[in-house]
């Protein structure tokens, strides 16, 4: 049920930009935040950047003809492929290098701070940081929206098709909504100041491909109407600083009923979180992380965190809990000239 789109750049057409023949920097480092996609009713459309977990990507420009080398360290790095064509950051690197037309090579070092298979945009964060760092290093001048399209290509490695919900949030930050695929367009809005998310990540791995395979090929009209209404409530809540409306928008009838089976204890965790004061609860992305919305002005986050932890524990599952605010997108943290 992913919606793919075409990448409309080539080595000749750089979006009508003049690109320098030589790289701008020899070494660039970028950070990109974790993200939660879907957020309930916004399947494949909504995303939010989570200002608590990050991937770091370092790019070195070398005099090796159009070759990408990839190294991975950090959380779960032993399970992440280092062949560029099988890694989200590697796919992005090869696409940007081809688009640049430059006769150079790239050495990519990924430091994972976000566990793969957690539903927190781990692959998207690596792709986003890679896109931003390479754009800076090679002096390509692509805009954020253009970089999102390159980063979305990287998601082929994780999901089988390009998709932009996670990478949009990781690059642009805060709340993002994809409003068109052809032509591609995405909008960003800040969320209310009192927005906080409690994220419980159980020790369960859910691969995006697997989570997609359990989704129905056809949905009931009534379920589609429900989700459209709730998605509208979510956006209205963001625009009017109304957390109650945002919480309503986290109610999903299209993906959650099917993906919940991949997360032991999900409905127990959701029930306990709501009883503890959460305004809304949803599966984060493809799962298994569970995302709860809380009002930080009421100091409910620790109580909700404990409730979610207990919900998994009574089902025999250990989990890690993180509390995060919506945050800014990917950023450059270091540059070195030649």
Q: Where do the protein language model's features map onto the residues?
A:
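Glycine-rich, charge-dense phosphate/pyrophosphate-binding loop(s)
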Residues: 238-338
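Short beta-strand-to-turn element immediately C-terminal to the catalytic PLP-Schiff-base lysine
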Residues: 60, 170-181, 292-295, 333-335
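A generic local secondary-structure boundary/capping motif
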Residues: 44-48, 156-161, 165-168, 184-190, ...
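Glycine-rich beta-alpha junction loops
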Residues: 34, 52, 174, 201-206, ...
């Amino acid at each position: 049920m992913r919606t793919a789109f075409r990448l409309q750049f080539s080595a000749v057409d750089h979006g009508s930009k003049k690109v320098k023949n030589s790289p701008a920097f020899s070494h660039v480092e970028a950070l990109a935040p974790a993200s939660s996609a879907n957020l309930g009713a916004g399947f494949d459309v909504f995303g939010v950047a989570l200002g608590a977990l990050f991937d770091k990507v370092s790019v070195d420009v070398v005099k090796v003809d159009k070759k990408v080398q990839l190294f991975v360290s950090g959380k779960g790095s032993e399970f992440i492929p280092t062949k560029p064509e099988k890694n989200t950051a590697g796919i992005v690197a090869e696409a940007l290098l081809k688009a640049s037309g430059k006769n150079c090579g790239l050495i990519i070092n990924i430091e994972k701070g976000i566990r793969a298979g957690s539903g927190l945009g781990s692959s998207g964060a690596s792709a986003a940081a890679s896109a931003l760092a390479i754009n800076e290093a090679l002096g390509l001048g692509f805009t954020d929206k253009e970089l999102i399209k390159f980063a979305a290509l990287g998601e082929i490695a994780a999901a089988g098709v390009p998709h932009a919900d996670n990478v949009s949030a990781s690059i642009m930050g805060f709340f993002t909504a994809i409003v068109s695929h052809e032509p591609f367009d995405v909008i960003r809005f800040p969320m209310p100041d009192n927005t906080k998310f409690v994220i419980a990540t159980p020790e369960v791995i859910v691969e995006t491909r697997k989570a997609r395979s359990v989704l129905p090929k056809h949905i009931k009209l009534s379920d589609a109407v429900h989700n459209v209404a709730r998605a509208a409530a979510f956006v209205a809540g963001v625009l009017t600083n109304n957390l109650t409306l945002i919480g309503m928008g986290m109610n999903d009838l299209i993906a959650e009923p099917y993906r919940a089976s991949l997360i032991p204890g999900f409905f127990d965790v959701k029930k306990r979180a709501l009883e503890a004061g959460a305004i809304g609860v949803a599966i984060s992305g493809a799962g298994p992380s569970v995302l709860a919305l809380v009002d930080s002005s009421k100091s409910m986050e620790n109580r909700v965190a404990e409730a979610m932890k207990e919900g998994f524990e009574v089902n025999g599952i250990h989990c890690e809990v993180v509390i995060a605010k919506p945050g800014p997108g990917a950023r450059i943290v270091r540059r070195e000239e030649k």
